[in-house]
């Protein structure tokens, strides 16, 4: 299984948000897509999870064509997407938010096992199961969003800016958790981040996007070492 | 004392009806953002179905679920074949915020004239399964009948079933989630389109039950339930338009204000009261008692 994106283009009306993008993410790799605001990072994830249509090209996860069918069906094929901005439902309790991710799963025993795993991963959520989503701190909300995505037992996890709006210490925690999840499971992770340094540090592979085009791609250690990338994207 | 008891009991019975009608409107509004003027027409057509059943079988207890089923089906059809394509096609430009409202008015018109064609505009008597005469205790006759008791108990049971369904079942959770955050729900695997149709169907059933509860003892015509739309909206707005609990409370507040005004002040004021209550709420607390931002109820 691998994520294969070939010649993918996506338009927002007259504006080309993603231009002829091609890359492959191998199974169990953690890949970070970095780039400035408007580089097309969120658009890429939203296209892969079926929220918006592509204009041209191909994208597949294993044998599943990601450009066909609705988002609610993609998740059944092993693709979970945590959208930008702590994607939890504030009106629902923590437990309801988690359960939501597994409602479609037929095997309730397996779903319960996943829930146990998620609560071991995020014990703070376990202490707050009956609280409403909007009573959580920013970091806890992000954990809940990731937890909800894991409840669908994904093979491919798409994460959109998990560090957004979080305090530096919390950002570090979230990144570490993402790395831990990738290390201890079969998950393939595609992480989109404006916090380029933080993301590249935990990633195996880095993809640098600029205005919808790939500028650089390679092992993230190489990208961090590249003076041009450092100057343009890592800020030193 | 008798006055007080009468006013409270009538208020309770009327309030129950308004509450259920408000719930029907809230279920549609919070899941699809449609202010559904057709609700009165849907309830009316469903009540005619109930009337057909009751005249054939002479059994109200078959007519009630039959009407509810018809109401659910009719609502699901309207959502699937009109509102859903409309939301997709008329999603941009000046028409977007009003398209569904105008469409719902259109549906109301179609249902009015359709019912008039099928059943004529002649008023039909809907037999009540219980007495509609005031209950006599000692020498006083209270303006409160067995039919009122039937209304109150049925509405309470229906509300409890809805509450259980929404709070305790998986499908109920999907409905709430899809109402609040359709995109996140989609990403979590909720089939949002399907769930919305179910929301409309539940609303249609609630409206149908209103019609079949309120009509017995009086007459049914294509326009006889239209006034409930007004009361239902006022009750829904009092409750914040999005909250089922708010709808219940809004209905009760409206029912009580109407009955107390008509018994203590003048029955001539009953047409003004709902609008006064509505204006007060809109000016003092425009988001309603349960409405607004973070305080909205799941």
Segments (PLM) and residue ranges:
Chain A
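Conserved structural motif at the start of ABC-family nucleotide-binding domains
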Residues: 3-5, 18
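ABC-type ATPase nucleotide-binding domains, specifically the catalytic core motifs of the NBD
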Residues: 13, 31, 94-112, 121-126, ...
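The feature captures the beta-strand-to-loop junction immediately N-terminal to the Walker
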Residues: 34-36
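Helix-to-loop junction immediately C-terminal to a conserved catalytic motif
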Residues: 49
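Conserved ABC transporter NBD signature motif
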Residues: 57-65, 77, 110-115
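Conserved ABC ATPase signature
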Residues: 132-136, 140
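ABC ATPase C-loop
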Residues: 149-150
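Helical segment within the ABC ATPase nucleotide-binding domain
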Residues: 172-186
């Amino acid at each position: 299984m691998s994520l294969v994106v070939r010649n993918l283009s996506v338009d927002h009306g007259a504006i080309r948000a993603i231009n002829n993008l091609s890359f492959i993410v191998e199974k169990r790799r953690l890949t970070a897509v970095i780039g400035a605001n408007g580089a097309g990072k969120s658009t890429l994830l939203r296209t892969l999870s079926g929220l918006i249509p592509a204009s041209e090209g191909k994208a597949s996860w294993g044998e599943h064509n990601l450009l066909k069918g609705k988002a609610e069906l993609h998740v059944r094929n092993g693709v979970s997407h945590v959208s930008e901005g702590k994607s939890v439902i504030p009106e629902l309790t923590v437990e309801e938010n988690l359960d939501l991710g597994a409602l479609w799963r037929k095997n309730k025993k397996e779903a319960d096992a996943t829930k146990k795993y998620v609560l071991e991963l995020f014990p703070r959520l376990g202490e707050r199961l009956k609280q409403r989503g909007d009573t959580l701190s920013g970091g806890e909300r992000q954990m809940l969003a990731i937890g909800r995505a894991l409840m669908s037992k994904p093979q491919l996890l798409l994460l959109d800016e998990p560090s957004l709006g979080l305090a530096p210490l919390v950002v570090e925690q979230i990144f570490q958790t993402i790395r831990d999840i990738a290390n201890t499971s079969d998950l393939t992770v595609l992480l989109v981040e404006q916090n380029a340094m933080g993301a590249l540090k935990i990633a195996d592979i880095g993809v640098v996007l600029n205005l919808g085009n790939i500028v650089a791609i390679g092992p993230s250690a190489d990208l961090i070492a590249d003076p041009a990338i450092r100057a343009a994207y890592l800020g030193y | 004392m008798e006055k007080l008891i009468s006013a409270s009991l009538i208020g309770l019975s009327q309030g129950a009806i308004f509450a259920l009608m408000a719930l029907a409107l809230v279920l549609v509004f919070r899941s699809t953002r449609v202010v559904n003027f057709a609700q009165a027409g849907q309830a009316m057509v469903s009540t005619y179905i109930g009337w057909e059943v009751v005249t054939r079988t002479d059994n109200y207890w078959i007519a009630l679920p039959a009407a509810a089923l018809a109401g659910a089906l009719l609502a699901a059809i309207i959502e699937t074949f009109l509102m859903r394509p409309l939301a997709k096609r008329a999603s941009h430009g000046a028409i977007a915020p009003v398209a569904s409202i105008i469409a719902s008015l259109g549906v109301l018109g179609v249902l009015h004239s359709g019912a008039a064609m099928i059943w004529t505009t002649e008023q039909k008597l809907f037999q009540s399964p219980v007495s509609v005469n005031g209950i006599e205790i000692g020498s006083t006759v209270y303006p409160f009948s067995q039919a009122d008791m039937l209304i109150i108990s049925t509405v309470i049971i229906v509300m409890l079933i809805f509450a259980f369904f929404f709070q305790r079942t998986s499908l109920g959770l999907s409905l709430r989630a899809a109402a609040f955050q359709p995109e996140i729900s989609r990403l979590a695997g909720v089939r949002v389109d399907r769930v919305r149709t179910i929301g409309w169907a539940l609303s249609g059933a609630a409206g149908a039950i209103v019609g079949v509860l309120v009509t017995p003892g009086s007459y049914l015509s294509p326009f006889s339930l239209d006034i409930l739309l007004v009361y239902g909206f006022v009750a829904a707005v009092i409750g914040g338009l999005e909250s089922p609990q708010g709808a219940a409370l809004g209905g009760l507040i409206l029912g009580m204000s109407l009955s107390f005004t008509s018994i203590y002040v003048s029955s001539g004021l009953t047409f003004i009261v709902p609008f006064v209550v509505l204006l007060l709420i809109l000016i003092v607390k425009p988001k309603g008692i349960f409405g607004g931002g973070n305080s909205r109820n799941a």
